Structures are given as structure tokens and as C-alpha cells.
């Protein structure tokens, strides 16, 4: 056990109840937790092989149970990690993991754009590939990582979708941004999905990812806290910021002009032990950015 783990174990008896009280208040609300409206086709943009589970995993499973065709497009090749394995070994292992996750979450198809992990770019080639995917699937909902995020690939994926939708004026569906590294301020969430019946499947899917060096407990704990946003409380929920095409484009364009360095500004929310730090690091700035760029569609 390294020094970091020893320190976390030492402070946990104090940190855990304090975290529970503060985040219990932070996520206290009277929102309506909903079941998904029935849709036919869903497209999920996942920069990395686990984002589809960490963010909207319970909601996707609910779509599948309702009969929707869920198509997941992974943007990167999955070749980067804190690991002793080669890039080729990692890519093969992660695709095997996704084969298992596909069955657990009920995904109809999985495809790969194969951009280098950590180097996602919105290029003419990637835009044309995404445009073709959207035209083929005709999704009523597109799930995408947020522009405001601590990982450059998550921001770049939002930009890629925004750039693509600028050239697709006939797209009438909605875009749901889902949380990964940076939890949404509760005031920014405009769709709260009750995933109590699907949470066990989400947990099962996270347990598939042996290739991942990070912990997942913080992501899953946040689903429990977000249940407190509902009145009456639900066991677990996933929160989204939903936009129409024009609103999503405006949101991304405005943030791009601001030229913030989000990886330096925010911390990943993957560990329960560090949730307070991760959620409240530059929280006022994050909340203000959502307020200034808000014109969502519900």
C-alpha cells in the first residue's frame, strides 16, 4: 500500500461522514426523476471504453429495456493508460471488455472511430464519419460528454459533435450531455433519470473493466447522491444537460471562445474519498460557465 492509500485510510473515518453530510445537502432537491420517454434509436459518443458505462450506463440500460436500438461510437482506440501493457494489448483487452459490456447494457451495436487516445480532434474526416453515422442511425437522442470536463478528449468529443451538427440543419433530435470527470452543478441538470432498477447492471458493467487503472466508486456514489435531487428521493439517478441542436452548438462555441484550460481547473470525481475536492474545485467558475451558456432543451 502506497503513502497516498495509507493517508486516505487514515482520514476516512472523519472524511466519509463529512462528505456524506455536505454532498447530501448539495444534492438535495425537488426535481422530478423520470423514466426515459420511449425512443427508437439512440447514439452514444464515448471518447473512451468505459465512458458509456460511467456516465449514462443506467439510462442506456433503461433505453434498451424499453426496446430502443442503442448504437455506441467509441472515438479513441483505447491505447493509452497507466499500465505495463503495450498499446496493442490494451486495445485488444478493452475491446474484449466492451463485448461483455455491450451485452450487460443492451447495446445494439459498437463501432470505433480509432482516433489516438488522448489526441481527439475535430477534423474533416472525423466530422464526415460522424455525419454518416447520424444519417444512418437517425437518432432521436445523442449522448455526448460535456465540453466542460477535466479530460481533453471529452471536451474534443463535444466539439466534434458541435462542428458536425453545424452542417446538419435537418437534425431534429436532442443532445444529452452526460457526466464523467466533472459533476454538473445541480442547477445545470434539466433531465434526471431514475435508474434505481438499472443500477445493479451499471455496477456489473464497471466490474468488467480490469484494464482500467482508476477507481470507479466515486462515479457510482454520485448516482446515489443524485437520487436525492428528486422528490421523493430515489435510490439512484443519472443527471443530464439536454439541448436541442442550436442550443448545444451555441454552448460549445461560446466555451471554445473563452479558451479555458479545463484539465487544470477541475479534478476527476472517480474516488469517494476525494469527492469533496473534486466537486468543489473551482465550483463557482463551473457553475457560472453553465449559467452563461445555458439555453437547454427539456
Which functions belong to the PLM regions below?
Residues 2-45, 103, 109, 116, ...:
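Metal-dependent de-N-acetylase/amidase catalytic core
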Residues 22-25, 62-66, 93-97, 107, ...:
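Short acidic/polar alpha-helix capping motifs at helix-coil junctions
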Residues 37-88:
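ATP-dependent adenylation/pyrophosphate-handling site
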Residues 75, 112-115:
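Short glycine-rich catalytic loops that host catalytic nucleophiles or stabilize transition states
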Residues 78-110:
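Glycine-rich phosphate-binding loop and adjoining beta1-alpha1-beta2 segment
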Amino acid at each position: 500500500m502506497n503513502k497516498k492509500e495509507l493517508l486516505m485510510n487514515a482520514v476516512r473515518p472523519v472524511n466519509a461522514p463529512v462528505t456524506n453530510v455536505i454532498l447530501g445537502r448539495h444534492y438535495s432537491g425537488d426535481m422530478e426523476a423520470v423514466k426515459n420517454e420511449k425512443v427508437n434509436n439512440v447514439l452514444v459518443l464515448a471518447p473512451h471504453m468505459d465512458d458509456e458505462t460511467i456516465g449514462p450506463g443506467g439510462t442506456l440500460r433503461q433505453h434498451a429495456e424499453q426496446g430502443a436500438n442503442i448504437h455506441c461510437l467509441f472515438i479513441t482506440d483505447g491505447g493509452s493508460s497507466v499500465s505495463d501493457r503495450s498499446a496493442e494489448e490494451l486495445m485488444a483487452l478493452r475491446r474484449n471488455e466492451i463485448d461483455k459490456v455491450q451485452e450487460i447494457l443492451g447495446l445494439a451495436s459498437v463501432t470505433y472511430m480509432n482516433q489516438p487516445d488522448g489526441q481527439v480532434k475535430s477534423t474533416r474526416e472525423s466530422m464526415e464519419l460522424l455525419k454518416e453515422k447520424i444519417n444512418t442511425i437517425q437518432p432521436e437522442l445523442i449522448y455526448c460528454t460535456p465540453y466542460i470536463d477535466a479530460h481533453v478528449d471529452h471536451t474534443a468529443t463535444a466539439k466534434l459533435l458541435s462542428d458536425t451538427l453545424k452542417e446538419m440543419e435537418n437534425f431534429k433530435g436532442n443532445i444529452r450531455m452526460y457526466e464523467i470527470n466533472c459533476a454538473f452543478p445541480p442547477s445545470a441538470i434539466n433531465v434526471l433519470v431514475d435508474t434505481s432498477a438499472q443500477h445493479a447492471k451499471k455496477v456489473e458493467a464497471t466490474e468488467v473493466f480490469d484494464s482500467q487503472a482508476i477507481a470507479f466508486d466515486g462515479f457510482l456514489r454520485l448516482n446515489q447522491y443524485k437520487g436525492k435531487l428528486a422528490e421523493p428521493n430515489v435510490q439512484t439517478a443519472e443527471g443530464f444537460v439536454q439541448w436541442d441542436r442550436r442550443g448545444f452548438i451555441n454552448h460549445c462555441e461560446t466555451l471554445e471562445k473563452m479558451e479555458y484550460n479545463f484539465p487544470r481547473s477541475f479534478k476527476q470525481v472517480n474516488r469517494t474519498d476525494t469527492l469533496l475536492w473534486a466537486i468543489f474545485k473551482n465550483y463557482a467558475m463551473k457553475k457560472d460557465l453553465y449559467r452563461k451558456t445555458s439555453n437547454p432543451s427539456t
